[in-house]
Every structure is written in C-alpha cells, then in structure tokens.
Amino acid sequence: MRSNLSVGLDAGKALAVAWDVPVIGVHHMQAHALTPRLVSALEYRSSSGPDFPFLSALVSGGHSMLIESTGLADHKILATTGDIALGDCLDKAARAILPSHLAVPPYGRALEQFAFPAGASDYNYTAPAKRDAELARRVTKWGWGLGAPLAGSKNGSSSRKMVYSFSGLLSSIERFVKYEYDHQNSTISSQLRQPGELSDDERRDMAKEVMRVAFEHLASRVLLHLSSLPPAEAAKVKSVVVSGGVAANCFLRHVMRAFLDIRGYSHVELFFPPVELCTDNAAMIGWAGIEMWEAGWRSQLSVRPIKTWSMDPSASDGGILGVEGWLKV
C-alpha cells in the first residue's frame, strides 16, 4: 500500500510543480469523516454540515473507530478495535456463511443481500431498550445464539470499555457453521456438519444475526460515550457521522437509527454518505484537500507517505497537523 501511495503522491507533486500550484496532503480517515460535508456542498446547502462538534463511526475493512471531531484537524479517538475491523469480520463471516455460488466479492454486500433478499421489509428488527437486553444472548430456533462482544467478561467489566472487538463474534459464527449443535447439552459439539446439512434458512439466520450483533456493538459505544457526558456537553452533540465501506450497509443504517431512538437520542441526526461515497473514493480526498486549503494549510514538496498516522492531536505523532511538512499561509 505504501508503494502505491508513493506513486500517487509523487505524481501529484509533479503536477503541482508543472502547474505551479500548491500540493496538500490528506489523511485518509479524515477524508471519510468529512465526506458528509462534501455531500452538503454538492447539494448546495447553505451550511456544509454536519457542524462541529460531531461524532464519527469510521468503519471499513481495515478500520473501526469512534472519533469526536471538534475541528477540521481535531479528531479525538474515543474507541478503536482491539483486534479486527468490522468490515474484515463481515467479509470473513460471509465467506463462511454464504453458499459457495454466492460467496463472491464484495463479500459484505453479498452477505447483506443474502440475509435480506426483499430489502428493508425483511429486517423485522427491534432495538434493545435497555442495556441488559443489549448484552443478552438471543438463542435462535436452531439452538445457537451469538453473544454481544465483550459481554462475557468477568462481572461484565469489559462490556463498558470504550473498545471494539469483533474477533470473538467471527470465531463463534465460524464454529456454528463448522460444527453440529448439541441440543441436549445446549452447546456446540465436536461433530463436524455433513456436506449439505446447513440449510439456506439457517445460513440466512446466521447472516442476520452476525450483522445485528456487530452493528449493535458499534452503536453501543456511541451510547456509552453520550451517556458519559455531562448533560450540557451531551446536548452539544447533535450529529453522528457513519462513514467507510461498511456504512454502505442499509441494515447498519436501520440499526443505528433504531438504537439511538429507543435509548433517548432521537434528536441526534445520523449522517450517512451516499453508497458510492462510502467506500474509498477520489472525491472525498479532494474535498478534504479543499477544506484544508480553505483553512490555510499547504504541504511542502518534501512530504512522503506515512505508514502510521494518527488523527488524534494527543497521540505521540501529534495527529494530523503534528507530522512534518505542513505550511500555514
């Protein structure tokens, strides 16, 4: 990836020299967070909202983080994944769950389409009204049930940590696919499922459940943060951006809205970019560059691709503006 970025950056710097125009380096995840502001500009709204401060859940195959954005380059990381990203979890779950003829990329989209062939009319989803219902394991008609990530820790202490964890969820669904369920002892057996034993109906329930549990886990950290704020501070947060490749999932959008509504945050507006702007795209990079330009920032021609670059000003590298190569004009 770094070599690809080097080629693109060098080409951009060459064009900047040839055309005698400035070059502006862009943080990839900053661009995702600012995408709804691009959408507002494209729709010719009077305000390029959402207005700061707002929260962003940035979810893709490589990232899962919740950030608080108080300014163009001021993004505090509130929660991030302790193991694998949400998109990675769903891709691997799809490859395990889907019938072989349907297991084609993009896997996350294939999983959603398989789970909900009729779209939103298939959702039949009710968000948990209370925390204990959120953490409870919902047993399916097949006997198995997926537990909420981090809910099984001693005394439930980890269930309130501001961290995401999707590896356990993936491991559980892979076991359910591979091994028969022992109904007598209410546990997964060591007996391998026979070829063709896993019906499409059970596969579809697996697809629905792995997405439901994953998306509720994502939403739960938004609620934990909002509930931790003093009322006056919580009132300032009027928007939550959900961006990145996984944000294209329509069921995620439904779960996030239902989750906030039933837990007393119906006033918080959710911003989801159009599907075509959820995955990595040039438009979001260009827009982030425009916003940095208008704020007076330029990059020196000596800048190079950065392998690890935090968004958070409190990080060891100083965040977006903490790295070398910026010029303020």
Regions found by a protein language model. Give the residues of each.
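Short beta-strand-loop/turn "lid" adjacent to the catalytic site in phosphate-handling enzymes
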Residues: 1-12
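Acidic, glycine/GT-rich loop-and beta-edge segments that sit at the periphery of enzyme/chaperone cores
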Residues: 292-329
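Glycine-rich beta-strand-to-loop/alpha-helix junction loops that act as flexible
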Residues: 1, 15, 60, 239-249
